[in-house]
Amino acid sequence: MKVIFATIWLIAGAWSQSAEQLGCIWYGQSHMIGAHWVNKGDTNPARPLNSPTSEAIFAKRCPMLYKEYKGESGEDELSLCCDAAQIETMESGLSQADGVFSRCPTCTRNMALTVCAMTCAKNHTLFLTAYNDTNDAGVDYVKYIDYRLTDDTVSKIYNSCIGIQHTQTGRPAMDLGCGSYNAKTCNYRRWYEFMGDVSGDYVPFQINYKWSEDAEEGSNEIYLDLSPLKCGESYEDSYACACIDCEESCPLTDAPTGPDELWKIAGLYGVTFILALIIACALSFFIFWGAFGKTSAPSVCMPTLFGEFFYHGFRIWGTFCAKHPVIVLALCSWAIAGLSFGIRYMTITTDPVELWAGEESQTRIEKDYFDQHFGPFYRTNQMFVKAVNQTYFTHETSNGVLNFGPAFEYNFLKEVFELQDSIMKLGMADNEGLDKICYAPVLMAGETPTVDRCAIQSVYGYFQHDMDRFENSYVDSNNYTINYLNQLEDCLRVPMMEDCFGTFGGPIEPGIAVGGMPKVAVGEDPDYMLATGLVLTFLGRNYNDESKLEPNMKWEKLFVDFLRDYKSDRLDIAYMAERSIQDAIVELSEGEVSTVVISYVVMFVYVAIALGHIRSCRGFLRESRIMLAIGGIVIVLASVVCSLGFWGYLDVTTTMLAIEVIPFLVLAVGVDNIFIMVHTYQRLDHSKFKTTHEAIGEAIGQVGPSILQTAGSEMACFAIGCISDMPAVKTFAMYAAIAILLDFLLQITAFVALMAIDEKRYLDGRLDMLCCVKSGGKKINDEDGDGVDRPKEVGLLETLFKNFYSPFLLSKPVKVSVLLIFTVITCLSLMVTPSIEKGLDQEMSMPKNSHVVKYFRYMVDLLAMGAPVYWVLKPGLNYSEPLQQNLICGGVECNNNSLSVQLYTQAQYPEITSLARPASSWLDDYIDWLAISDCCKYNVTTGGFCSSNSKSEDCLPCERGFTENGLRPDAETFNKYIPYFLFDLPDAECAKAGRASYADAVIYTIDDVGMSTVQDSYFMQYSTTSTTSEEFYSQLREVRRISGEINAMFKENNVDAEIFAYCVFYIYYEQYLTIWGDAMFSLGMSLVAIFLVTLLITGLDITSTFIVLFMVICILINMLGMMWAWSINLNAISLVNLVVCVGIGVEFVAHIVRSFKRAEGTAQERARHSLNVTGSSVLSGITLTKFAGIVVLGFSNSQIFQVFYFRMYLGIVLIGAAHGLILLPVLLSLLGPPQKLARSSGAEPTASITITTN
């Protein structure tokens, strides 16, 4: 193939073409077609340009041609194939391109090469062929031309421009500049063919590009061949493109690596794996050594210093309360009444932010800062709509067969659009419509929004909410059907085309409007045409002042009610309004009342039956203790009410969840103490006591210390829970701690008094609940003080323990097996503990039947775009100073580590940083906007602002000044026109105008002379889709790392500025960044608290204390293993439950250890005795009571109840019982001392805690 290339900047003398070859194809302009001038056909040679203004434009836009034509001396006559008017038209066209591509000077200079050659080069006929026509005045004009270019030239120009970013949207500029193609589907030919297509709005006549690679063999046609520079290179007196727009200009930096990978063995955390293995091997060795060796077990002594102090104190106190029950009850009732009155001051919150984010947490501080300066994030009302018929289909076009997903089936789309029309009309009849509450960013200042101007993200916007346009269909000349699918193809591929803008004046993001496409790599755009569902988003204004939100709340309720009642055979809808989560929290609380009440009733019935010792149906009402059980439960609930009142006085906000769960928790704990006190009293040898109140005092003396130990441990653990920064958890812990304290105080006072009254009723032969009626049986009470002839009571459960369970458990083979099994299970639990996932599934916080649960599920399937991240830059910069501008901007001459460049660089690694696009930059767009002469306008009459598209004669271009290099506005210009930029709406001429994107992003003040000073501002950046807790907290961790690096850059440059990243979701996930550290601290502090409480209550008995501590640690480790096995995540709720586990674990251990300490005989005998007497009580009084109430929670409608209360509390009970009733007796039988340390008293030494059952 013979192709002749022409290089236009070779000096004219080097060309040997004839004069005819060097002629023009046009000169001057003939007339306008539409908004564009067309050129006169003219084949004469080039003519001199006699307009200094136009010559200056030509010199600026076409410097190479200018230098060539002016000669080396610069004095040659400038002869061109264009006149002054054509140069001005060329300038106008290039200015439009500047609005998109001006961020990269090399790109615009490269583009100008071919435009200048086409418009003015004096050798037109070498590479242009004109096709003329005659207008009505008989003047020849050029109708269209053939423009012959080499592929290499245009490819280089295209490559220099392909990386340019449109900073307002974070998209490539080529998305706006390649017609129906986006940056990924565009190429150099498609780009130039779009710029030559007369059917567009920007081309005055058709330009048919002829490509050198398509030239026929042997052709003598000449193709214009130029040498454009790469984007990283610069022309003389110009600049190379910046890093954001040109990868070649970016400095070499290390890619972010994310968090360090943990060392793992077999998928488990290596450190705990090896540690558990070592412990397992060591313990197994000692177990076998002890089992088969001849050495006897070590003798462990348990000395005490003041163990009797608590016994005597509680005995005296119990005796006093039993002797004066009326006074005690009166005083307690007054205290209860006084504290309960505080409930009237109690406040309950359902605000998710108030529930899950502490006021001093970093994300809460950042959220409050953002809300106060820029206003709170929009109120989002959103729908996900799936097609019931999930059938894919095709559509034939001139470009081939297109594949479409079920979301674009005609009847489905039509119904969705009709549904959207109905939603947009909600409330309009009552003047409470969407237009009253919606967010409308593209409005002139003072303009009142209409529904059409509301920001609604929906594919219906691609048809401008016009059903006729959607239904329009016809067959083109090639017999292809042109319908709504063609429009969808164009708009899904290039949403930045003006024909695809929504009625509100902005683009519809495909990633926000459609979903369910096949998965692609992170950072890649999916094939939107294969969507299986649609997303409709209605944005509402939000306010810090909640009183202004009433119209929003009304419309959102209309939205929810309408969609709840909407039925369709084609549409499967999930929806959520901004208010839905708060409504769901209220619904959750109200819905769980029945579950909680049933749980309480079950425990009450159990207590009422088990508390008495019923021997026959005839003596039921005498031997039952229903009234005592009711009194005990009332005391427990009174302690909860008093706790609510106590914190109400102190104005501590609480939640419905706390109000529902705390009574259950305190009831489970309090009922244990009821059993312990009653049955300890029943097991006494009453003949050794002169009066009933002395016997009761003795019972309280025996069990009081252990009750104090367990209550103190639980209260201390809840107090540790108050350290949590999460309000819902903190207030739960605070209320529970006081409730347990008050419950303890009321039980050792009021309940003791009730025991005395009930015992007097029993001894007098009166019936339970009918105390005025006496039974026909013998009266037991002995008024002469010679003792009370009441039989000792031994229950069935204790008998079973004594005759069967204890001998079996404490046999040598079983003890060895128990130790081995618990060693293996505990070590396995330790191995898997670090593998527990952090987080809280969003669905769990909602009722199962809530519409929000379905919304969360559909969000995982259909959401293709993440939430916006706002990089908030606090005051401290002088933006009018170029050196400080360079720290922020991303354009020419900006620092390579500037804020914008760093955010751009991080967005190149979305799989790590979760940043999907480069950030918008108001500063870059403002500088670009000022650089275009016709964008900034002012009114010469008023001196005020004029919009850039104003055609008024009173509106003239702003008087602007620039720095010496011409790149930046001077300080006066910069400060003067910031309000103009933020008031100006973008259009084709001034795409960088800032009102739509930045009206809320820049906070500024204006001084007396009209100069603006920027204070706070933000830079918005879209994130990748995040739906799990791990994705959200990983993103938060990364943006904090990035903001830290940017702040470090500010410090290096001695700038007192600070930046932070804000996203509306971060506030819920901050806890997971430190959850393991918080867990270790809280659990460690809880264990320390238990150690100190136990050491004190046991009279500084170090051995007993360590045994209790060791057992509680084992319970905790196995609880963590259960969490891993049962898929319970670690979060603030489960952490508090673990702290509760530590506290309640003491109950399963402390009573048995105390009983062992007081018993007589060898370690084996004492272990068997403590298991028979106290172990049976632990099973019936602690384990079964909690189990009865917990099982009911399994039927809860709340997943939080099911997972974090049913599963975890069930685990606490079962694991605690297993350790207390299986492992502990075995350990005590091996480690217990041979000597007797029991205290002698009037009571039977071995009498302890038991619950009798028949």
Curated annotation (Swiss-Prot):
Residues 294-325, 615-625, 679-736, 837-857, 1101-1105, 1154-1174, 1229-1254 are cytoplasmic. It is found in: Cell membrane. Residues 1-16 form the signal peptide. PROSITE patterns: SSD. It holds the Pfam family Sterol-sensing. The keyword Glycoprotein applies. Residues 17-272, 347-593, 647-657, 758-815, 879-1079, 1127-1132, 1196-1207 are extracellular. It comes from the Eukaryota. GO terms for cellular component: membrane; plasma membrane. Disruption phenotype: Larval lethal at the second instar stage. In larvae dietary cholesterol absorption is impaired. In the larval midgut there is a severe reduction in cholesterol and failure to accumulate cholesterol-rich trafficking organelles. No effect on total cholesterol content, possibly due to maternal contributions. Glucose absorption in the midgut is not affected. Disulfide bonds join C24-C81, C62-C116, C82-C120, C104-C241, C107-C161, C178-C186, C231-C246, C243-C250, C438-C454, C491-C500, C889-C894, C935-C990, C936-C958, C946-C955. Its main location: membrane. Residues 592-757 form the SSD domain. The keyword Membrane applies. Glycans are attached at N123, N132, N389, N479, N896, N939. It catalyses: cholesterol(in) = cholesterol(out). Keywords: Cell membrane, Cholesterol metabolism, Disulfide bond, Glycoprotein, Lipid metabolism, Lipid transport, Membrane, Signal, Steroid metabolism, Sterol metabolism, Transmembrane, Transmembrane helix, Transport. It is a multi-pass membrane protein. The chain crosses the membrane at residues 273-293, 326-346, 594-614, 626-646, 658-678, 737-757, 816-836, 858-878, 1080-1100, 1106-1126, 1133-1153, 1175-1195, 1208-1228. Expressed in the midgut. GO terms for molecular function: cholesterol binding; lipid transporter activity. GO terms for biological process: central nervous system development; cholesterol homeostasis; cholesterol metabolic process; cholesterol transport; dorsal closure; intestinal cholesterol absorption; peripheral nervous system development; sterol transport. Important for cholesterol absorption at the midgut epithelium. Acts only in the early steps of sterol absorption, prior to Npc1a-dependent intracellular sterol trafficking. Belongs to the patched family. PANTHER family: NPC INTRACELLULAR CHOLESTEROL TRANSPORTER 1, NPC INTRACELLULAR CHOLESTEROL TRANSPORTER 1 HOMOLOG 1B. This is NPC intracellular cholesterol transporter 1 homolog 1b.
